[in-house]
Swiss-Prot record:
Lineage: Eukaryota, Metazoa, Chordata, Craniata, Vertebrata
Annotated tissue distribution: Expressed only in cartilaginous tissues, such as vertebrae, ribs and shoulders.
Domain VWFA: start-end pairs: 83-258
Cellular component terms (Gene Ontology): collagen-containing extracellular matrix; endoplasmic reticulum lumen; extracellular matrix; extracellular region; matrilin complex
Domain of life the protein comes from: Eukaryota
Predominant location category: secreted
Record's signal peptide: 1-28
Gene that produces this protein: MATN3
Annotated region (Disordered), positions in chain: 32-75
Outcome after substituting residue 134 to K: In EDM5; retained and accumulates within the cell
Protein name: Matrilin-3
Residue positions where Omega-N-methylarginine is found in the record: 198
C-alpha cells in the first residue's frame, strides 16, 4: 500500500488562536440565508427537479437511483477518462457516521467510473486544520483496491482549511510525478471538494489559480456549508458545479448527478450519429461510421455506396456481370444463351426448340447460340432468310432428262419424250417407237412424203407441249407468290 504523504501543519500563530476560532456561534438555518439555494432540489443544469428520496440502508441502492457500477440508461453512457481528486473535509464538525457517509459517496462515484491506467485515475486529499494526501493518482489501478483504500481513511482534527487543501491538491496531487497525465493527453483534471463548514482561510485566489492551471472544481456543501465560499471555489457555470444537501444522510444521492456529469453519451445508442449503415462507438462519446458488406464509405464519412463488384474482376461470370443496388451482383448471358444452375456459366439456348425462330421449313441451331433457316429439297431460301420458294430443277439443267424436263408443283420434276419416242425404265432416256423407226427408214418413193408427214406431226406435238409448259409455269408463279405473301 502506498505510503501516505505527511500532513501539512499550520504556523504556530494560527495554532495559538485556534481555540478562539472554535467558539460556538449562532448558525442560522442555511435555507434562510440570502442567496443560499438547496441544490439537491434542482435537476441537472439547475432545472427544477425532485428532492432526494430518504436514505436507504447502507449497501442497498436508494429508491430512484441506479445500482453501483451500472450507468443509468446502461449502454448509452460510458465514463470519460479523468484525473479525479476528491478533497474531503474531515474536521471535528463531521461526525464519524457522517464521515462514513462521505466515504460511501466517494465509493459510489468510483462505482460509476471505469478505473485503470488508461481510464480514470483517482486520488484522495483529506483535510481539516492539516492536509493529508491519502493516496495519489498512480496508487490504484483497479476499482476494488481503490474502494478498499477509501474505506480505510480516518478523520483528521479540527479546522476547515479548504484553501490549503486546494493548494495541496494542485501542487502535489495533480502532477505527472503523482500520476496525472501530461497536458498533451487532453485528459480532464477534476477536483470534487466536500465540506460542511465555512473555510478558515482564503479560497477565492487559490481556487482561481487552480482553475487557471486547468483543474475543473466541483463544490459540494453539506448542512452549514457557506454558499458564497462554495461559489468562490467552484468553476463556471456555477449551476453545474455547485451542489448542496441538507444532511450527510443524503449526500450519496449526488453520485448519480456526477455520473451524468462524467458520462460520455454514446451517439450510436442515442441515434444521433447520422451513419447510413453502421455506427461504431469509440468511447468518450466519439464514434465512426462503417458500411455493410458490399459497400464503401463515402467522403462524408457517413453515407455508403455500393462497391462495383464487377469492376473487381472477382465475380466469376462467364459472360456479363451486373451490379445490384444491394451492393452485390449477378451474372447474365449473351443473347442466345441461358444461365446455368451455378448462376455463373452460360449454355447456348435451343432457339429452334423454343418455336420462336420463324423458319418456314427447317430451323438449325448454331454453336454460337444462334440459329439459321433452311428449306426442304427442291426449295430455295428467300432473301428474308426465313421463307422458302420452289426451285425450278428443269431450269437448272441438272435434271438428266434426255428429251424433255417437266417441272411439277412440288418442287420436283419428271422426264418426257418427243413424239414417236417412249420413256425408258430409267425414267430419263427415250427410245423411238416401232412406227417412228419404220417411217424414218423407208426408201420407197413415198419416203419423202412420209418424212414430211412425220415432221408435221412432231411439230404439232411440240406446239402442244410448249402450250402445256406455259400453263405449268404460270401455275408455279401463282403458287410461289401465294407462299411468299402467306
Amino acid at each position: 500500500m502506498p505510503r501516505p504523504a505527511p500532513a501539512r501543519r499550520l504556523p504556530g500563530l494560527l495554532l495559538l488562536l485556534w481555540p478562539l476560532l472554535l467558539l460556538p456561534s449562532a448558525a442560522p438555518d442555511p435555507v434562510a440565508r440570502p442567496g443560499f439555494r438547496r441544490l439537491e432540489t434542482r435537476g441537472p443544469g439547475g432545472s427544477p427537479g425532485r428532492r432526494p428520496s430518504p436514505a436507504a440502508p447502507d449497501g442497498a441502492p436508494a429508491s430512484g437511483t441506479s445500482e453501483p457500477g451500472r450507468a443509468r440508461g446502461a449502454g448509452v453512457c460510458k465514463s470519460r477518462p479523468l484525473d479525479l481528486v476528491f478533497i474531503i473535509d474531515s474536521s471535528r464538525s463531521v461526525r464519524p457516521l457522517e464521515f462514513t457517509k462521505v466515504k460511501t459517496f466517494v465509493s459510489r462515484i468510483i462505482d460509476t467510473l471505469d478505473i485503470g491506467p488508461a481510464d480514470t485515475r483517482v486520488a484522495v486529499v483529506n483535510y481539516a486544520s492539516t492536509v493529508k494526501i491519502e493516496f495519489q493518482l498512480q496508487a490504484y489501478t483497479d476499482k476494488q483496491s481503490l474502494k478498499q483504500a477509501v474505506g480505510r481513511i480516518t478523520p483528521l482534527s479540527t479546522g476547515t482549511m479548504s484553501g490549503l487543501a486546494i493548494q495541496t491538491a494542485m501542487d502535489e496531487a495533480f502532477t505527472v510525478e503523482a500520476g496525472a497525465r501530461e497536458p498533451s493527453s487532453n485528459i480532464p483534471k477534476v477536483a470534487i471538494i466536500v465540506t460542511d463548514g465555512r473555510p478558515q482561510d482564503q479560497v477565492n485566489e487559490v481556487a482561481a489559480r487552480a482553475q487557471a492551471s486547468g483543474i475543473e472544481l466541483y463544490a459540494v456543501g453539506v448542512d452549514r456549508a457557506d454558499m458564497a465560499s462554495l461559489k468562490m471555489m467552484a468553476s463556471e457555470p456555477l449551476e453545474e458545479h455547485v451542489f448542496y444537501v441538507e444532511t450527510y444522510g443524503v449526500i450519496e444521492k449526488l453520485s448519480s448527478r456526477f455520473q451524468e456529469t462524467f458520462c460520455a453519451l454514446d451517439p450510436c445508442v442515442l441515434g444521433t450519429h447520422q451513419c447510413q449503415h453502421v455506427c461504431i462507438s469509440d468511447g468518450e462519446g466519439k464514434h465512426h461510421c462503417e458500411c455493410s458488406q458490399g459497400y464503401t464509405l463515402n467522403a462524408d464519412k457517413k453515407t455508403c455506396s455500393a462497391l462495383d463488384r464487377c469492376a473487381l474482376n472477382t465475380h466469376g461470370c462467364e459472360h456479363i456481370c451486373v451490379n445490384d443496388r444491394s451492393g452485390s451482383y449477378h451474372c447474365e448471358c449473351y443473347e442466345g444463351y441461358t444461365l446455368n444452375e451455378d448462376r455463373k456459366t452460360c449454355s447456348a439456348q435451343d432457339k429452334c426448340a423454343l418455336g420462336t425462330h420463324g423458319c418456314q421449313h427447317i430451323c438449325v441451331n448454331d454453336r454460337t447460340g444462334s440459329h439459321h433457316c433452311e428449306c426442304y429439297e427442291g426449295y430455295t431460301l428467300n432473301a428474308d432468310k426465313k421463307t422458302c420458294s420452289v426451285r425450278d430443277k428443269c431450269a437448272l439443267g441438272s435434271h438428266g432428262c434426255q428429251h424433255i424436263c417437266v417441272s411439277d408443283g412440288a418442287a420436283s420434276y419428271h422426264c418426257d419424250c418427243y413424239p414417236g419416242y417412249t420413256l425408258n425404265e430409267d425414267k430419263k432416256t427415250c427410245s423411238a417407237t416401232e412406227e417412228a423407226r419404220r417411217l424414218v427408214s423407208t426408201e420407197d418413193a413415198c419416203g419423202c412424203e412420209a418424212t414430211l408427214a412425220f415432221q408435221d406431226k412432231v411439230s404439232s406435238y411440240l406446239q402442244r407441249l410448249n402450250t402445256k409448259l406455259d400453263d405449268i409455269l404460270e401455275k408455279l408463279k401463282i403458287n410461289e407468290y401465294g407462299q411468299i405473301h402467306r
